[in-house]
């Protein structure tokens, strides 16, 4: 099965210069946990911001989320796959890079969607492989320096 058959095609983004407070509010209103991050200079996707990025890299460190910007805490570089890739390729990328979401690109390398662990669970992926991916991305990474 192809990634385009299981991905979420409605793609919203946020700019690197958007405050974390505004970003968190946007995520809350959309009931989502991540957004692609776009550079205001060239309108290209340069990273991903997740609810976890906001909590771990900002709130837990005592930063002011009303003045700190997305570009300061986003995850980068991006983990991507193509819409015509097999679902197993997306799961392999998630497992290797320890991420829960992968940006989906078309044949012109333009963003067209996101594929998440939840999307994979809805597809025909082997349950043992899905379990392996979930375990790997859920294993704590080495702690970041303060």
Show which residues each predicted segment covers.
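A glycine-centered beta-loop-beta connector
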Residues: 27, 35-53, 94, 102-118
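Short N-terminal leader segment in a subset of presequences, especially plant chloroplast
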Residues: 8-17, 43
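The conserved cystathionine-beta-synthase
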Residues: 13-31, 38, 81-98, 104-106, ...
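Tandem CBS (Bateman) regulatory domains
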Residues: 1-10, 50-80, 85-95, 111-146
């Amino acid at each position: 099965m192809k990634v385009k058959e299981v991905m979420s095609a409605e793609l919203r983004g946020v700019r690197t210069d958007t405050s974390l407070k505004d970003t968190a509010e946007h995520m809350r209103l959309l009931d989502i946990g991540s957004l692609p991050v776009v550079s205001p200079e060239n309108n290209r996707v340069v990273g991903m911001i997740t609810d976890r990025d906001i909590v771990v890299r900002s709130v837990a460190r005592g930063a002011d989320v009303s003045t700190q910007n997305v570009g300061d805490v986003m995850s980068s570089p991006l983990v991507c796959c193509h819409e015509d890739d097999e679902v197993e390729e997306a799961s392999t990328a998630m497992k290797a890079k320890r991420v829960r979401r992968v940006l989906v690109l078309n044949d012109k390398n333009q963003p067209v969607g996101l594929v998440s662990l939840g999307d994979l669970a809805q597809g025909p992926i082997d349950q043992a492989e899905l379990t392996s991916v979930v375990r790997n991305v859920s294993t704590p990474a080495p702690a970041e320096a303060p």
